[in-house]
Amino acid sequence: MKTILSNQTVDIPENVDINLKGRTVIVKGPRGTLRRDFNHINVELSLLGKKKKRLRVDKWWGNRKELATVRTICSHVQNMIKGVTLGFRYKMRSVYAHFPINVVIQENGSLVEIRNFLGEKYIRRVRMRPGVACSVSQAQKDELILEGNDIELVSNSAALIQQATTVKNKDIRKFLDGIYVSEKGTVQQADE
C-alpha cells in the first residue's frame, strides 16, 4: 500500500542555525558545525516559519520501507542539534582480572595506546575519528572519556577501542578483560 504523503517536523532551538543545500543539512551551534548529506534518500527537506525554526521532512508516495526514512532523517537531525548544543560524551571502563590494562593517550587525545592487555607485550594503537577527543578520567580509576559533537563518530571511536581489546582463542565467558562503554551522555547538562 502506498501512502500519499508522510511528513514530520523537527523543532530547531533558538541558538541553532540550520541551512539546507539540496538534501545536505548544515547545523551550526555553540559547539561547532555539523553537516550531513541525505542525497541517497528521496525525500523533500524544507524550513518552515518566518524565522525558519522548523525543519520539515516530506515523503510522497512511499511504501513502508521508504516511509521509515522520514523518521530516520528527523532523528539524525535531532542528534546533530544535540551535538552542536550539548555535545556527546561516552565513558569507558577497563575490566581486568589479573593483568592491569595500561592506557596512554597520545597526540592530544587523538591516539589511544593500550598496553599489557592480558599481559601481552603487543601495543594496541587506536586512532580516534576526526572531531573526537579522548582523555583519561581524573576522578575514576581505569576510565576513558570520549567527547565530540557527532554521535556517530564518538560511538564509532568507542567501538574501535572495544574491538581492539577482543580476546582471541579463549573462552570469552571466562576471559572478560577489555575496555567497555559504561556510560553514554552529553558534555553539558541539559537545562530541565
From Swiss-Prot:
One of its GO terms (molecular function) is rRNA binding. Signal peptide: none annotated. GO terms for cellular component: cytosolic large ribosomal subunit. InterPro entries: Ribosomal_uL6-like (IPR000702), Ribosomal_uL6-like_a/b-dom_sf (IPR036789), Ribosomal_uL6_a/b-dom (IPR020040), Ribosomal_uL6_CS2 (IPR002359). Component of the large ribosomal subunit. Belongs to the universal ribosomal protein uL6 family. This is Large ribosomal subunit protein uL6.
